[in-house]
Curated annotation (Swiss-Prot):
This is Iron-sulfur cluster insertion protein ErpA. Belongs to the HesB/IscA family. Gene3D superfamilies: HesB-like domain. It comes from Vibrio vulnificus (strain YJ016). GO terms for cellular component: cytosol. Binds 1 iron-sulfur cluster per subunit. HAMAP family: Fe_S_insert_ErpA. The keyword Iron-sulfur applies. Pfam families: Fe-S_biosyn. Keywords: Iron, Iron-sulfur, Metal-binding. Its cofactor is iron-sulfur cluster. Homodimer. GO terms for molecular function: 2 iron, 2 sulfur cluster binding; 4 iron, 4 sulfur cluster binding; iron ion binding. InterPro entries: FeS_biogenesis (IPR000361), FeS_cluster_insertion (IPR016092), FeS_cluster_insertion_CS (IPR017870), FeS_cluster_insertion_RrpA (IPR023063), HesB-like_dom_sf (IPR035903).
């Protein structure tokens, strides 16, 4: 992650977990797609899914041989953020450390700008 001009960061922890999940699926074409949808208690919520394709206009960010994909509409809400992964007492999850969020819900799954 030496390219400081990227609009969004993909942490080593998230990349490591994605690499493990892709290996379990036995499909090296998979990429982690992060997206924003309306909903949640704060107005917007984060979504994560695996996708084999990169659409026109998508931004891709690579770390440790795995790719994060973001569509242009979602990227505007994620600029300057970090896609990360954590394991703790509350379970394991991908999350976004988003500097654009003015408020977030208690679990961190939704936000407002």
């Amino acid at each position: 992650m030496s390219d400081i001009n990227l609009p969004l960061s993909f942490s080593d922890a998230a990349a490591t977990r994605v690499k493990m999940l892709i290996a379990e699926e036995e499909n090296p074409a998979l990429k982690l797609r992060v997206y924003i949808t309306g909903g949640g208690c704060s107005g917007f919520q984060y979504g994560f899914t695996f996708d084999e394709s990169v659409n026109e206009g998508d931004t891709t960010i690579e770390n440790s041989g795995v790719t994060l994909v973001v569509d242009p509409m979602s990227l505007q809400y994620l600029i300057g953020g970090v896609v990360d992964y954590t394991e703790g007492l509350e379970g394991s999850r991908f999350f976004v450390n988003n500097p654009n969020a003015t408020t977030t819900c208690g679990c961190g799954a939704s936000f407002s700008v």
